[in-house]
């Protein structure tokens, strides 16, 4: 899962893997900025924390369990504000189970923002069809400010990714995106998402993404 890295943190021993937010020194790749560490099969990069996510009630988010308590779970939603999932808001919690038997530290979940109190403490719920623990698939991390572009007008961009690649995608408003399906198609979806993030300010992006997917599918022999 994605973690926060600081300038100077070692990211890779392969200098050819150096991506955005990194630098190479002595044949090794280090973080140049503070941000989210993101790794693909070929590259490592650091996603800036500028534009960090500010939660709103009803938002779908993807988070990582950081602490387990008797009454619920502390969840990192990559926001300056704390998030908590009460046991009463997790349908998988049963009377004969302990919280750490349902979700443990390091587990990833899809949840919704249920409430935000005046001190910006965030309460999450998993009582929604879209919510689930993430047991498989891949999590892609982008700048939260680019989420609307990944979704597209009236969901057009996300529909394109799903229909062309036949993958499941859940976009968290906090910049974490869950992708599940055939491994090769998931990899192409991940690449396409990064393309959208990088070129979010440009025109004609939907057509370029469609062409990119078509080309990458041909490269790996997908009809």
UniProtKB/Swiss-Prot annotation:
Residues forming the KH domain are 135-193
> Can you give the residue ranges of the S1 motif domain?
58-127
State what this protein does. Non-catalytic component of the exosome, which is a complex involved in RNA degradation. Increases the RNA binding and the efficiency of RNA degradation. Confers strong poly(A) specificity to the exosome.
Anything noted about its domains? Contains an N-terminal domain that mediates interactions with the hexameric ring, a central S1 domain and a C-terminal KH domain.
State the similarity comment. Belongs to the RRP4 family.
State the name under which the record lists this protein: Exosome complex component Rrp4
Key words, A-Z: Cytoplasm, Exosome, RNA-binding
User: What do the Gene Ontology cellular component annotations say?
Assistant: cytoplasm; exosome (RNase complex)
Subunit note: Component of the archaeal exosome complex. Forms a trimer of Rrp4 and/or Csl4 subunits. The trimer associates with a hexameric ring-like arrangement composed of 3 Rrp41-Rrp42 heterodimers.
Q: Does the keyword rRNA-binding apply?
A: no
Q: Which InterPro entries match?
A: Exosome_RNA_bind1/RRP40/RRP4, KH_dom, KH_dom_type_1, KH_dom_type_1_sf, NA-bd_OB-fold, Rrp4, RRP4_N, RRP4_S1
Q: Name one GO biological process term.
A: poly(A)-dependent snoRNA 3'-end processing
The gene for this chain is rrp4
Q: Which organism is it from?
A: Archaeoglobus fulgidus (strain ATCC 49558 / DSM 4304 / JCM 9628 / NBRC 100126 / VC-16)
Primary location class = cytoplasm
Q: Is RNA-binding one of the keywords?
A: yes
Q: Note the SMART domains from the entry.
A: KH (SM00322), S1 (SM00316)
GO MF terms here are: poly(A) binding
Q: Where in the cell is it found?
A: Cytoplasm
């Amino acid at each position: 899962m994605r973690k926060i890295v600081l300038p100077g943190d070692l990211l890779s021993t392969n200098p050819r893997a150096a991506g955005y937010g990194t630098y190479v020194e002595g044949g090794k790749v280090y973080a140049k900025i503070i941000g989210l560490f993101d790794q693909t099969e070929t590259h490592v990069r650091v996603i800036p924390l500028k534009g960090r996510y500010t939660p709103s009630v009803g938002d779908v988010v993807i988070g990582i369990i950081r602490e387990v308590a008797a009454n619920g779970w502390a969840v990192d939603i990559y926001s300056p504000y704390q998030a908590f999932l009460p046991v009463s808001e997790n349908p998988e919690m049963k009377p004969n189970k302990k919280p750490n038997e349902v979700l443990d530290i390091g587990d990833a979940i899809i949840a919704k923002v249920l409430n935000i109190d005046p001190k910006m403490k965030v309460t999450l719920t998993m009582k929604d069809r879209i919510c689930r623990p993430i047991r498989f698939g891949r999590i892609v991390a982008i700048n939260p400010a680019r989420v609307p572009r990944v979704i597209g007008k009236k969901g057009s961009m996300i529909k394109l990714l799903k229909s062309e690649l036949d993958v499941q995608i859940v976009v968290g408003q906090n910049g974490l995106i869950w992708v599940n399906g055939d491994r090769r198609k998931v990899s192409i979806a991940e690449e396409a998402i990064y393309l959208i993030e990088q070129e979010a300010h440009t025109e004609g992006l939907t057509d370029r993404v469609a062409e990119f997917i078509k080309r990458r599918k041909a490269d790996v022999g997908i009809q």
